[in-house]
Amino acid sequence: AFQEVQKKKWDSPYRDWFHLSFDGDTEYHDGFWYEGWEGHNELVKLNLWNPAVIEHQFNAIRSWVERFGIDGLRLDVAYCLPPEYLKRLRAFAQGLKPDFVLMGETLHGDYNRWMGPELCHSVTNYECYKGLWSSFNSRNMFEIGHSLARQFGPEQWTLYKGAHLLSFLDNHDVD
């Protein structure tokens, strides 16, 4: 779709699939400006408010469920996805398969913004990454103890009581 926009510009039927303007340019000199993910123009940002984009994505998910029997998705950079989009995605996926799981990658902030009954089932627990690493590598249990108490402790104010976060020791983003 984006190559079609590069070729036909404003005459492309996909021009509304992306955040772009024909009044500017990028470092790639395509003859128009477009928004990239977190400033990376090689990763062109999709317009998730466009019904045609959502339909295209949902059709792809439907085909993966039918052809391969997938029962979940890991959403890279889920923190960039609007909650309204996540709600639509969850409703669609569970309509295909009631036990379909959405796992979102989140870095910082309140994970409840991306996780809940209508959003992702779970998200990555970057807050505990360093504490887990320290507990295994330097026997420092304070960091992980503090983070886990803050997230799941017995107090009423804990952040994620009853939630299931994906904690990890290593991944491709922390090497």
Where are these regions (language model features)?
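Substrate-binding/active-site clefts of carbohydrate-active enzymes
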Residues: 1-62, 67, 92-95, 112-113, ...
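Active-site-proximal helices and loops of the catalytic beta/alpha 8
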Residues: 2-9, 62, 66, 76-160, ...
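Generic secondary-structure boundary/loop-capping signal
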Residues: 14-15, 40-45, 121-123, 129-133, ...
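Active-site-adjacent bridging/hinge elements
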Residues: 33-34, 59, 163-170
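The substrate-binding groove and active-site-proximal loops of carbohydrate-active enzymes
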Residues: 39-54, 71-80, 132-142, 171-175
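Short loop/turn motifs at secondary-structure junctions
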Residues: 68-69, 168
